[in-house]
Amino acid sequence: MQTDNKYRVNPFPSKREQNFSPREIILIRLDFPCEREGFCCFAHQSLTMTTDLSWLSRTQLLIGETALKRLASSHVCVVGLGGVGSYAAEFVARAGVGKMTIIDGDVVDPTNRNRQLPALATNHGESKASIMAERLRAINPELELHVISSFIRPEQVLDSIAETPSYLIDAIDSITPKITFIKTALERKIPLVSSMGAGAKLDPTRLQVVDIAETFNCPFAQQIRKQLKKRFGIRRGLKVVFSPEEPIKESLMLTDGTNFKKSAYGTISYLPAVFGAVCASVAIRDLKDEG
């Protein structure tokens, strides 16, 4: 029976009835013997049964129970589910974050298959957000997931989310919507990490996490810095993932301007995934250390 977002649970007949929230049920350490081995309850919209939560045991072994509880009670929003954002979203889910919002209005294109997690030969034209939602729920069926699979104005992204996220991962790859989203997030003082350009580069060992004012050798970061300063007077205070590797300029290609993009750089399979991993690591490490 649900009362005030608590679930009345009594799997142990000889013990008094217990009141747990869904996340407390996942992570609680019982201080009495379990008379029904493997019993646990979790609810999302309704109360369901689950028998195995051991998939997070290696994470708890590394970061401890307290940090794991912090992640379980956190809400991470990933904006953009391409080569960077799709991997960031997966790594966040696999770390045990309890609530996520994923946002992308795009569909899978054949050219996405060289680097994007949702892209397969069998799903061209399908929504990236819907594909990733199915994947994340398969990783963690108890994940509270909010999916936005339509294009929305960047300044309205945060208004479209019912609950203010604990952390934002910006994996938008177009300059105009990206700077508008960044400005909105900074104004609202929501913790944020932003991915810079993963194109035209090959070496994954060069990635760094710095303030945007400290970026160099990244044409994308240069444009973001320029536009943030010009339009909003923002010069620093934005945590970014970037690579100082010299870009391979010959890999530049002009495009038709679709989705705010006038050009694109060549990409290799692994580098956007590493950018996504570093973005996820920044969010996870910051969240686990809160408090």
Spell out what each predicted region is.
Residues 104-139:
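Glycine-rich phosphate-binding loop and adjoining beta1-alpha1-beta2 segment
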Residues 78-81, 102:
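Hydrophobic Val/Ile/Leu positions in short beta-strands of Rossmann-like dinucleotide-binding domains
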Residues 94-99:
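Conserved S-adenosyl-L-methionine
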Residues 84:
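Hydrophobic/small residue at the entry helix of a nucleotide-binding pocket
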Residues 149-156:
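Conserved SAM/SAH-binding loop
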Residues 47-77, 110:
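N-terminal charged helix/coil linker that caps or initiates catalytic domains
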Residues 50, 162-167, 172-177, 187, ...:
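Glycine-rich phosphate/adenylate-binding loop
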Residues 34, 40-41:
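Cysteine-centered motifs
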